[in-house]
């Protein structure tokens, strides 16, 4: 304010000298006007400085907002139907862990062991690969469960599922893709059935369908299955195998004997009953079907996890992958090979076998290139352009190079349910790799 400015001088008039008074008055007036102009100029400069400071502040805020908006950039979301490869949904390259379960009793110390944590750091690339395969499995089965309904052709269900896997896993030869044919076994057929080309089987309301499919990255396999039934009368049958599988997973661990897991599974499975069309059945574990260890490019790596008591005394070991799967049946609880074969797999330990048929040699080269020791089905051979191959395929089977896996069936008229997860016995904990929100 001007009244507070120290530049304004107040001088008393001199009465004796009128000229001096007049001169002094003019000087005082000039000084006063000059002071006012200086004050106005200073005030203007302050306002300019304030405006510039305000602009600078606004500019900084805008930059911060821009930076914040960049940080808040959302990750891509999966489409419906799914079409975006999972590698694009996780640009960091790190894929979600499965469900972590701590070891118990004598192995509880592993949870906090620095030495064991260091071992896990070395295995991180493998863990990440198999987690990527598991994430694909979760997203594909979520979609398939939402679209499957009575009246669909089994071939359409399988091809929709398999094509979705190919997209989401970024299929790339033997580096990434489908690990084995889509099993969609119905009712008394427990496993290893998929439609061959031309099959016209239609899914019915009263069917019990086991959807068993696999994904892999660099041969690291996720083997995971679930059962679909539209009629609620089958709910207890599905619950039996689901809870039995959870029990098997809970019991599994480093140094656990395989026979103990089987006994625990059977106890839970056979505690269930199911009423079908007015008749009550006790659910039975299928005694000649098992879970199994998994190796790179090897779906059955040598160890079997029984689902009844009285199995092997062999122990599970650190670092192993296992498919824990259970089958509950209203039939005899025993399967046999039946129906037309669709599943085949090159024997993992097959050495060089001389082949006489040129067509068999050609087919073997195709199998080596496209599947190696991963399982395949006739539809997959059709898809890559193979024709008139049945005689050559039989020759490869007869020579012991390729193993056929016909459908496995309980008694006709019975119903079988299945649930399965892949687990990893890490040095510090047990990871249920394929676990999802659904099961």
UniProtKB/Swiss-Prot annotation:
Q: Which cofactor does it need?
A: Co(2+); Zn(2+); Mn(2+); Fe(2+)
GO annotation, biological process: protein processing
Q: Where is this region: Disordered?
A: 1-90
What's the EC number here? 3.4.11.18
Q: Which GO terms describe its molecular function?
A: initiator methionyl aminopeptidase activity; metal ion binding; metalloaminopeptidase activity
Class of this enzyme: hydrolase
Gene Ontology terms, cellular component aspect?
cytoplasm; cytosol
Cite the binding residues for substrate: 192, 300
- Pfam (any one): Peptidase_M24
Residues engaged in binding a divalent metal cation 2: 223, 292, 325, 420
Compositional bias (Basic residues) = 61-73
Which portions of the chain have biased composition (kind: Acidic residues)? Answer: 41-51
Give the cofactor binding note.
Answer: Binds 2 divalent metal cations per subunit. Has a high-affinity and a low affinity metal-binding site. The true nature of the physiological cofactor is under debate. The enzyme is active with cobalt, zinc, manganese or divalent iron ions. Most likely, methionine aminopeptidases function as mononuclear Fe(2+)-metalloproteases under physiological conditions, and the catalytically relevant metal-binding site has been assigned to the histidine-containing high-affinity site.
Q: Which reaction does it catalyse?
A: Release of N-terminal amino acids, preferentially methionine, from peptides and arylamides
Give the CDD domains listed for this entry: MetAP2
Please tell me where a divalent metal cation 1 binds in this chain. 212, 223, 420
Its annotated compartments are:
Cytoplasm
Q: In which tissues is it expressed?
A: Ubiquitous. Preferentially expressed in roots.
HAMAP family, sorted: MetAP_2_euk (MF_03175)
What biological function has been recorded for the protein in this entry? Cotranslationally removes the N-terminal methionine from nascent proteins. The N-terminal methionine is often cleaved when the second residue in the primary sequence is small and uncharged (Met-Ala-, Cys, Gly, Pro, Ser, Thr, or Val).
Q: Which family does it belong to?
A: Belongs to the peptidase M24A family. Methionine aminopeptidase eukaryotic type 2 subfamily.
PANTHER family from the entry? METHIONINE AMINOPEPTIDASE 2 (PTHR45777:SF2)
Q: What is this protein called?
A: Methionine aminopeptidase 2B
Instruction: Give the organism the record lists.
Output: Arabidopsis thaliana
Organism placement in taxonomy: Eukaryota, Viridiplantae, Streptophyta, Embryophyta, Tracheophyta
């Amino acid at each position: 304010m001007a009244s507070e400015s120290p530049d304004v001088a107040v001088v008393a008039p001199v009465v004796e000298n009128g000229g001096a008074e007049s001169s002094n008055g003019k000087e005082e007036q000039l000084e006063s006007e000059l002071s006012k102009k200086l004050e106005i100029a200073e005030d203007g400069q302050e306002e300019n400085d304030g405006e510039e400071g305000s602009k600078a502040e606004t500019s900084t805020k805008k930059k911060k907002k821009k930076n914040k908006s960049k940080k808040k950039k959302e990750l891509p979301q999966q489409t419906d139907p799914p079409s975006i490869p999972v590698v694009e949904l996780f640009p960091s390259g790190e894929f979600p862990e499965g469900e972590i379960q701590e070891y118990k009793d004598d192995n509880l110390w592993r949870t906090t062991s620095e030495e064991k944590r260091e071992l896990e750091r070395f295995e991180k690339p493998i863990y990440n690969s198999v987690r990527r395969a598991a994430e694909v499995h979760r997203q594909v089965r979520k979609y398939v469960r939402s679209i499957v309904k009575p009246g669909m052709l089994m071939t359409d269900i399988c091809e929709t599922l398999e094509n979705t896997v190919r997209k989401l896993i970024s299929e790339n030869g033997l580096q990434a893709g489908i690990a084995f044919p889509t099993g969609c076994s119905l009712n008394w057929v427990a496993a290893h059935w998929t439609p061959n080309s031309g099959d016209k089987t239609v899914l019915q309301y009263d069917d019990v369908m086991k959807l068993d499919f696999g994904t892999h990255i660099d041969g690291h396999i996720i083997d995971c299955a679930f059962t679909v039934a539209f009629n609620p009368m089958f709910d207890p049958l599905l619950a039996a195998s689901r809870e039995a599988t959870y029990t098997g997973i809970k019991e599994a661990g480093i140094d656990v004997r395989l026979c103990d897991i089987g006994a625990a599974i059977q106890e839970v499975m056979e505690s269930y009953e199911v009423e079908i069309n007015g008749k009550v059945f006790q659910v039975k574990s299928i005694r000649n079907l098992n879970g199994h260890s998994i190796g790179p490019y090897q779906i059955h790596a040598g160890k079997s996890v029984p689902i009844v008591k009285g199995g092997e005394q062999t122990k599970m070991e650190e670092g192993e992958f296992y498919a824990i799967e259970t089958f509950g049946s209203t039939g005899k609880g025993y399967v046999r090979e039946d129906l037309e074969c669709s599943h085949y797999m090159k024997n993992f330990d097959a050495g060089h076998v001389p082949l006489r048929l040129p067509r068999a040699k050609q087919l073997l080269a195709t199998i080596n290139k496209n599947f190696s020791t991963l399982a395949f089905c006739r539809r997959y051979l059709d898809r890559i352009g193979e024709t008139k191959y049945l005689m050559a395929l039989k020759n490869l089977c007869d020579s012991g190079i390729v193993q056929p896996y016909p459908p496995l069936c309980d008694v006709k008229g019975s119903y079988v349910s299945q649930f399965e997860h892949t687990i990893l016995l890490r040095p510090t904990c047990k990871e249920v790799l394929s676990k999802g929100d659904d099961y």
